[in-house]
Amino acid sequence: MFCVQCEQTIRTPAGNGCSYAQGMCGKTAETSDLQDLLIAALQGLSAWAVKAREYGIINHDVDNFAPRAFFSTLTNVNFDSPRIVGYARDAIAMREALKAQCLSVDANAHCDNPMADLQLVSDDLGELQRQAAEFTPNKDKAAIGENILGLRLLCLYGLKGAAAYMEHAHVLGQYDNDIYAQYHKIMAWLGTWPADMNALLECAMEIGQMNFKVMSILDAGETTKYGHPTPTQVNVKATEGKCILISGHDLKDLYNLLEQTEGTGVNVYTHGEMLPAHGYPELRKFKHLVGNYGSGWQNQQVEFARFPGPIVMTSNCIIDPTVGSYDDRIWTRSIVGWPGVSHLEGDDFGPVIAQAQQMAGFPYSEIPHLITVGFGRQTLLGAADTLIDLVSREKLRHIFLVGGCDGARGERNYFTDFVTSVPDDCLILTLACGKYRFNKLEFGDIEGLPRLVDAGQCNDAYSAIILAVTLAEKLGCGVNDLPLSLVLSWFEQKAIVILLTLLSLGVKNIVTGPTAPGFFTPDLLAILNEKFGLRSVTTVEEDMKQLLSA
C-alpha cells in the first residue's frame, strides 16, 4: 500500500504516505492496492478512447463510466474491494469493445500505452492485490526522484478531483465531448509514467483549465434544474418527527428523495456539502426539507450515531459506520461503498423511507437556530455594484475568501481563529465544508450586506471566480489587484483540482493549510511559491497583517 492523496496521510522523517495495513482514512491496504489496479485499467481504457477518437468513434458510455469509476478512488468514497474490482473488470471490457471497434475500421489499429492491454490475473482478491503492486504510484521513486513523483501525483489527484465534478455534472445531464477528449488524453498520458518536469507542470495547469469548464457545466446543470440559489435561512436544530439525513453533493438524489418522501410524514435533513441545497428554489419548495444537521464530515461517527433515522451517502465523505453502530441504517448511493452496508442501485429510496417510518425520529422540536445560505452566482453578481460602492466609500476594506475542506487535524482551528479575527469592515466569502468551522457564528453586516456570505459547495468556487472576474472588469484592473485574498483549507482531491483551477487562471498569492500536501516536496513548494506566490498558513496575526497590507 502507498497512498498520499489526502491531508491526513501519515508523515514521518522517512517519508510521507500511508503504507501499512490500513490508511488513516480507514481504507485497507487491499482496497488501496486494488484502487491502484483500477486506475491502471482506467488509463488503458482512456488510451483506447483517445485512439477511437482518431477514427471518429465516440462512445458516450465509456465517457460516462471512466470519470465515475475514477471518482470511486477519491478519499472517503468507496472502501468496498469487490466493487472496486468490478469497476476494473468493466473498464477492461469497455476497452476491449473500443479496441474491436477500432480494428473494424483499421485492421492495424494499435495503442502503445503500457496500460492498453492490462488484464486481471485472477478472480481472487489476494492475487489481484499482488498484481496491483506493479502499479503502486511510487514504484519507480528511486529512479525518478521525489519531485517528479510529486508532480505526477499532483496531476493524478487533480484529474481525480475533476473526474468527480464531471460525474456530478453528468448526473444532471451536462457533458461536453471536448472535456471528455481532454480527460482521456491526460489520463492516458499519466499511464505512461511521464518523467518530464515541465510537461507535468503544464499538465497540471491543463487540468486546472479543464476543470474550470467542468465547473461551468456543473453550475449550468444545477441552476437549470433547480433554479439559481438565493439567500435562504436554514434551521440547524431538530424538528419533531421521523427523519432521513442525506449527505454528499448529489442534488438530484436529494430531489428524488424529497419527491418520494412528500406526504409520508418523514422530514429530510441535509448534512455536510448538501447544506447549500436549501438555497435552490426547486429544492426548498419542499416543506419537509426542514433543516441541516451536524457539522463537518469528520464528526459523523458521533453525530450520525445520535441521528434518529436512516442516513444516505450520495458521494464523499463516508467513514467507518461501525464505530458509532449505525451501519444498519446508513445507505450508500452511486460510487459510494462501505463493506456490509446497504447500497441503493437505482433512484428508488423506498427502503430508506420504510426504515425511517419504523424509527422514532426526533421526539420534540428544538429552539430554532437559523443560518443563511444561498449566495449563488446570480446573487453574487447582483451584489457586484454594491461591493464596488462600499469599497469606493471606504466602508468595505477587504474581501477574504475562506473556504475549502474540513478535517480532524487540530491545526484547522486556524480557520476559525482567522475569520473571527477579520476586521469589521471586511467581508468573508465562504464555500465548501470548511465553513462548518464558523458558519454558526454571528458576523453582523456592512450597511445591510452580511459579512459572512456562503457561496455554496466546493464546486461553487466557480461562482467566486466569476464574481472576482466581474469585479476586476468593472474596476478596470486584474483579479490579483482586487482587495481580495484567498485562504483555502484542503483535505482531498477536489480541493487539489480547485487549487489547480485558480492557479491556471492566474490567481496568485493564495494561502493554504493546515499543512502542505504530503506529495509536495520542498522543491515543488518553492516552484509554486515562485510562480504563483502560493504559500502555507503561518499564524493568524502574521497572515492577517500581510494580507490586509497587500
Curated annotation (Swiss-Prot):
Cofactor note: Binds 1 [2Fe-2S] cluster.
Organism, as annotated: Salmonella typhi
SUPFAM superfamilies noted in UniProt: Prismane protein-like
Pfam families: Prismane (PF03063)
Keywords: 2Fe-2S, Cytoplasm, Iron, Iron-sulfur, Metal-binding, Oxidoreductase
Main location: cytoplasm
Family: Belongs to the HCP family.
Annotated positions binding [2Fe-2S] cluster: 3, 6, 18, 25
Compartment annotation: Cytoplasm
Binding-site residues, hybrid [4Fe-2O-2S] cluster: 249, 273, 317, 405, 433, 458, 492, 494
Enzyme Commission identifier(s): 1.7.99.1
Protein name: Hydroxylamine reductase
Function: Catalyzes the reduction of hydroxylamine to form NH(3) and H(2)O.
Modified residues (Cysteine persulfide): 405
